[in-house]
């Protein structure tokens, strides 16, 4: 049996009594106080996440921008230094290798942040596409710990530990600066649908930083949050999860991410397939569902209409914010009308669900 990898915060999680699970080969906290309580803490106050398992790839060289324009579906030329962009990374068939964040230091220097379980695969994919480009790629995943502080009180809490004016960091921008005396990269990003920050720092400083944020944020009610609530938070905000809403057999257009596919761009991997799909119309569409009858629709459960299988669930759970069972499903567009009822097959039994708008939660302001 392969030994599970651990983040620099493993001892903090263990001491806090977190329930630990195998997540993509990492031993990670799935919950502390409980998923619903943690979820509500992030929506109403603040939560601190260990996301040190995420992968980081450093890209340098004079062709860095041209390489990213070829590698990714989004238009990386649109971002400035210290700005961040989200993009799918596709195969020539239009399926998704991964979705990632692009941090631009300069025209010749970028940091790419990828999903933990895909890090090695992504790095190999990037290297395989690099021929003919004057660039260097380095897997820097072991050099960074990453903490995410999310929720309406995130800025107020983090501001106690830094002299930088955090209000000056706009959404999807980043700065380098000291937090509690440690030089960090701080970005206004997250995976919860709330305001918040992601803090990149040397692994040896992560345990103290974790403890300090929980300490100074105590009066605001900050809590440590596990991967269980991270999933329900992102799901309510309709943020895709690789392996669920995205994958080698699902295109960004099917997943409703057409905004991040710039077909007017020069040649990029997947352009031909995605252009053809857009012209022809997507064969499947991601829809929101609410359960009418009792039951939770889980990933990969079949979806039927009048006894005919038409698609499957990508994600589903109880929504602590809406206080009902909801799901996302991938079905042909002709069935995708709001109000349409479908059957979710749960343990062999047909359970009724209704199609609703898929952005289940959007924060105010």
Swiss-Prot record:
One of its GO terms (biological process) is glycine decarboxylation via glycine cleavage system. Pfam families: GCV_T, GCV_T_C. GO terms for molecular function: aminomethyltransferase activity; transaminase activity. It catalyses: N(6)-[(R)-S(8)-aminomethyldihydrolipoyl]-L-lysyl-[protein] + (6S)-5,6,7,8-tetrahydrofolate = N(6)-[(R)-dihydrolipoyl]-L-lysyl-[protein] + (6R)-5,10-methylene-5,6,7,8-tetrahydrofolate + NH4(+). Keywords: Aminotransferase, Transferase. InterPro entries: GCS_T, GCS_T_bac, GCST_C, GCV_T_N, GcvT/YgfZ/DmdA, GcvT/YgfZ_C, TrmE/GcvT_dom1. GO terms for cellular component: cytosol; glycine cleavage complex. Its EC number is 2.1.2.10. PANTHER family: AMINOMETHYLTRANSFERASE (PTHR43757), AMINOMETHYLTRANSFERASE, MITOCHONDRIAL (PTHR43757:SF2). Belongs to the GcvT family. The glycine cleavage system catalyzes the degradation of glycine. The glycine cleavage system is composed of four proteins: P, T, L and H. This is Aminomethyltransferase. It comes from Desulfitobacterium hafniense (strain DSM 10664 / DCB-2).
